[in-house]
């Protein structure tokens, strides 16, 4: 399972700065669900190339009028409950405050790993700034400068070590972190996608069942659809106890293909299927998306598409998951309403025009069977092996139809392309000055690859890599005859100027 890290602390200690650095965003609007997570923001983060985790930015706790306990309950208690580890941030420049002491007292009462993080230690005597915080009775404290990334990597390695066997925190004998490497911004961190890695990923996926996550807002019909897919007799068998943030993983088979259904709503016994109130856990949904191959987003046809729907869809896209859309409760709507719903879908979901849309009734089973045709199509598109020669040929066709633009008087040259990964499919394009390609041309290439490869139901990513120039930064060494010619020319110029 993907670990969850919660950032807790009073206002202005740098929680949002650290959140933005971890999620590699600028505005912290990664998955801000209106109404449900008013005081908490959720984002995807990654340490290195393989270690993914979810980070929660909680609202600040000031501990004034109503008391810190009330504020904690309102803004951060739910986030702490959802988290696997808590990072308690304090301000090294401001020093210890009563609010910090109250928060620390609360964290000591819960059975949850909590780490004290002293932020804003850049440009000051860090040890002196941290001295007061030892009063909080902590065993260790960690010094960082979130604005510059100093100490963040080492902090994460320590925080996530219990969840990843290959992570070892870099510590000295007295427990202080020595590694102060920077957690780089996304534009500086260029991932190296190789054909060997892509082939290994392809082979791994061949032996795995398709993991299908059914997600959506509360009461759109996820439970009804899950029960319809599994069959009523399966519900009792798989009515397993789970926590508020753990989904239920249900193995199943359909059309000779093995699946693992990730149920975020929770499969209920027959007597409880008609419950009208469904608890919505954001973390549970985001974890399911991270772990899935294909995401089935359920939308209520009787309600307008909400910002929550778009946030869930955006999170699935950012995670690179294949997507199928199911518009539920379609039965009983008159034709005029149906036309209006379709127009609204076209207007608001144009950015996922590659995803199949199905109009279904989970309650009566109408259209449910066809969902799996699109699920298999999307998964096949995301995991089909494509050779280097085919990708390079498609790239050449694209450049023949529409040449890359000129940059600083030079034409950008695309040389060859190869596969860089699957689920989602990644195409790596090598060339010179490719980082100067405008976004419009990148979109053109992406759409050209999608159309040529007939990719449906999954996002496609293009990674551009500059080919190394073997003569870059090397002085041009003249031959003996060239040196003599140069001297004659210089002598002639001097004589002419006399």
From Swiss-Prot:
Record flagged with keyword Repeat: yes
InterPro entries, alphabetized: AAA+_ATPase (IPR003593), G_ENGA (IPR031166), GTP-bd (IPR006073), GTPase_Der (IPR016484), KH_dom-like (IPR032859), KH_dom-like_a/b (IPR015946), P-loop_NTPase (IPR027417), Small_GTP-bd (IPR005225)
Residues annotated as domain EngA-type G: 3-167, 210-383
Gene Ontology MF annotations: ATP hydrolysis activity; GTP binding; ribosome binding
Keyword GTP-binding: yes
Binding site residues for GTP 2: 216-223, 263-267, 328-331
Protein residues bound to GTP 1: 9-16, 57-61, 119-122
Any single Pfam family the record assigns to this protein: KH_dom-like
Residue ranges annotated for the KH-like domain, each copy included: 384-468
Record key words, sorted: GTP-binding, Nucleotide-binding, Repeat, Ribosome biogenesis
GO biological process: ribosome biogenesis
Assembly and interaction partners: Associates with the 50S ribosomal subunit.
Family to which the UniProt record says this protein belongs: Belongs to the TRAFAC class TrmE-Era-EngA-EngB-Septin-like GTPase superfamily. EngA (Der) GTPase family.
PANTHER family attached to this UniProt entry: GTPASE DER (PTHR43834:SF6)
Functional note: GTPase that plays an essential role in the late steps of ribosome biogenesis.
UniProt protein name: GTPase Der
Species of origin: Vibrio campbellii (strain ATCC BAA-1116)
């Amino acid at each position: 399972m993907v670990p969850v890290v919660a950032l807790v602390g009073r206002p202005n200690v740098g929680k949002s700065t650290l959140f933005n650095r971890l999620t590699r965003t600028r505005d912290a609007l990664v998955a801000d669900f209106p109404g449900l997570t008013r005081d908490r923001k959720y984002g995807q983060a990654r340490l290195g190339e393989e270690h993914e985790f979810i980070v929660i930015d909680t609202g600040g706790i000031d501990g004034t009028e109503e008391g810190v306990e009330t504020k904690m309950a309102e803004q951060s208690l739910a986030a702490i409950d959802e988290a696997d580890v808590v990072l308690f941030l304090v301000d090294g420049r401001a020093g210890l405050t009563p609010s910090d002491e109250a928060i620390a007292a609360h964290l000591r009462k819960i059975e949850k790993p909590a780490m004290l993080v002293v932020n804003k230690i850049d440009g000051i005597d860090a040890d002196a700034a941290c001295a007061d915080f030892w009063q909080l009775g902590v065993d260790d404290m960690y010094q960082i400068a979130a604005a510059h990334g100093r100490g963040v990597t080492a902090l994460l390695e320590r925080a996530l070590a219990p969840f990843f066997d290959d992570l070892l925190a870099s510590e000295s004998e007295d427990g202080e972190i020595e590694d102060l490497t920077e957690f780089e911004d996304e534009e500086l961190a260029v991932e190296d996608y190789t054909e060997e890695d892509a082939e290994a990923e392809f082979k791994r996926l061949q032996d795995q069942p398709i993991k299908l996550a059914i997600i959506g807002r509360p009461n759109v019909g996820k439970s009804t659809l899950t029960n319809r897919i599994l069959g009523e007799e399966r519900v009792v068998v798989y009515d397993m106890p789970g926590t508020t943030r753990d989904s239920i993983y249900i193995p199943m088979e359909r059309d000779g293909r093995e699946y693992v259904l990730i149920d975020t709503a929770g499969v209920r016994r027959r007597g409880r299927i008609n419950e009208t109130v469904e608890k919505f856990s954001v973390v549970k949904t985001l974890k399911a998306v991270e772990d899935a191959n294909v995401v089935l987003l359920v939308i209520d046809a009787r309600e307008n598409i909400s910002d929550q729907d778009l946030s869930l869809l955006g999170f699935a896209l950012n995670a690179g998951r294949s997507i199928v859309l199911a518009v539920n409760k379609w039965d009983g709507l008159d034709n005029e309403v149906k036309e209006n719903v379709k127009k609204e879908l076209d207007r608001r979901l144009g950015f996922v025009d590659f995803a199949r849309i199905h109009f279904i009734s989970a309650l009566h089973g109408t259209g449910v069977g066809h969902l799996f045709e699109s699920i298999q199509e999307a998964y096949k598109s995301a995991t089909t092996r494509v050779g280097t020669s085919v990708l390079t040929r498609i790239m050449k066709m694209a450049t023949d139809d529409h040449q890359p633009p000129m940059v600083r008087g030079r034409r950008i040259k695309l040389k060859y392309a190869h596969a860089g990964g699957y689920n989602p499919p990644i195409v790596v394009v090598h060339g010179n000055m490719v980082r100067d390609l405008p976004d419009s041309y990148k979109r053109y290439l992406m759409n050209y690859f999608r159309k040529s490869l007939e990719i449906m139901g999954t996002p496609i990513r293009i990674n551009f890599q500059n080919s190394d120039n073997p003569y870059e930064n090397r002085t041009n060494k003249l031959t003996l005859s060239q040196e003599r010619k140069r001297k004659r020319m210089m002598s002639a110029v001097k004589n002419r100027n006399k």
